[in-house]
């Protein structure tokens, strides 16, 4: 009986890891598409719309993704950084994502899912604290937004999104993106089928080519200029309120207010 229970636990762990890896690869493709077209897909809308509107993402100076970021005691599943300008005073958004996978999605209030949620919130709080120790110096406002995401193992549907209150810190957005990328320990594999592209022009025949498989950290969706690196600590509030969105019922964007990060992002583009 004990051996059977161990095998069941191992199979569940392997299934969760496979789901994590598939979701990572899907995020890379979805975010690249949103950056190009200015429209979020069904997976990214509950995660990003309230923080960075799709049209704002399209005009951002730099967007990067890093997976399994090693912060020492914690390792957030995904960190997305968005840069809105150049220089040490450029504003940006840093989204920390903790991913939880579910075999069954009908009931999101089971005891196991509640334990997953509590554990994920603790992980996010610790990750924010640890990330503060790696912040490079800079005067740019960075919105640090921790997000807990429940995903169905079948279909990779986003079931529920829970947010901690965002924090505003000051750093260099470009250097922060480079620092986080160096700490990443996982890069989604690129298959031959997905890397094959077909170039079509009006005057020449189409030609197929293959991109080389990357072995290091995943490359930013748009390149950001590096600068000098250092570390500076920042303070976070001890308590943070959670905002939960059930994506299975339907995603409803929050109204714009002073506490809404969407209003903060919109203010970046307001006329001076």
From Swiss-Prot:
Principal subcellular localization: virion
Membrane-spanning ranges: none
Top-rank taxon, per record: Viruses
Localization, UniProt: Virion; Host cytoplasm; Host nucleus, Host nucleolus; Host Golgi apparatus
Keywords recorded for this protein, A-Z: Host cytoplasm, Host Golgi apparatus, Host nucleus, Late protein, Virion
InterPro entries for this protein: Herpes_UL24 (IPR002580)
Up-regulation conditions: Expressed late in the infection cycle.
Keyword Nucleus: no
Any one Gene Ontology cellular component term annotated for this protein: host cell Golgi apparatus
Pfam families: Herpes_UL24 (PF01646)
Described function: May participate in nuclear egress of viral particles. Plays a role in the dispersal of several host nucleolar proteins including NCL/nucleolin and NPM1. Since deletion of host NCL/nucleolin negatively impact on nuclear egress, UL24 supposedly acts on this process through its effect on host nucleoli.
Homology family: Belongs to the herpesviridae UL24 family.
Name of the protein in question: Protein UL24 homolog
Species the sequence originates in: Equine herpesvirus 4 (strain 1942) (EHV-4)
Gene that this sequence comes from: UL24
């Amino acid at each position: 009986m004990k051996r059977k229970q161990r095998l069941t636990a191992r199979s569940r762990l392997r299934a969760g890891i496979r789901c994590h890896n598939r979701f990572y690869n899907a995020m890379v493709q979805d975010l690249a598409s949103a950056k190009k077209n200015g429209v979020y897909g069904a997976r990214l809308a509950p995660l990003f719309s309230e923080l960075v509107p799709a049209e704002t993402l399209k005009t951002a100076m730099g967007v990067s993704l890093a997976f399994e970021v090693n912060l020492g005691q914690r390792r957030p599943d995904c960190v997305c950084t968005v840069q809105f300008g150049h220089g040490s005073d450029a504003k940006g958004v840093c989204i920390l994502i903790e991913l939880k996978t579910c075999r069954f999605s009908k009931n999101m209030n089971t005891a196991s899912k509640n334990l997953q949620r509590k554990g994920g919130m603790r992980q996010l709080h610790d990750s924010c604290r640890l990330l503060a120790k790696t912040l490079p110096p800079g005067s740019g406002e960075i919105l640090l937004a921790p997000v807990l995401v429940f995903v169905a193992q079948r279909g990779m549907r986003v079931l529920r999104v829970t947010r901690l209150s965002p924090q505003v810190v000051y750093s260099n957005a470009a250097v922060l993106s480079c620092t986080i990328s160096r700490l990443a320990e996982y890069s989604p594999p690129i298959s031959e089928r997905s890397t094959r592209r077909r170039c079509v022009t009006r005057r020449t025949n189409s030609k197929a080519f293959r991109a080389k498989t990357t072995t290091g950290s995943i490359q930013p969706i748009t390149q950001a200029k590096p600068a000098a690196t250092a570390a500076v600590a920042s303070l976070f509030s001890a308590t943070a309120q959670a905002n939960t969105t059930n994506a299975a019922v339907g995603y409803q964007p929050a109204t714009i207010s002073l506490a809404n990060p969407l209003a903060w992002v919109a203010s970046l583009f307001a006329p001076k």
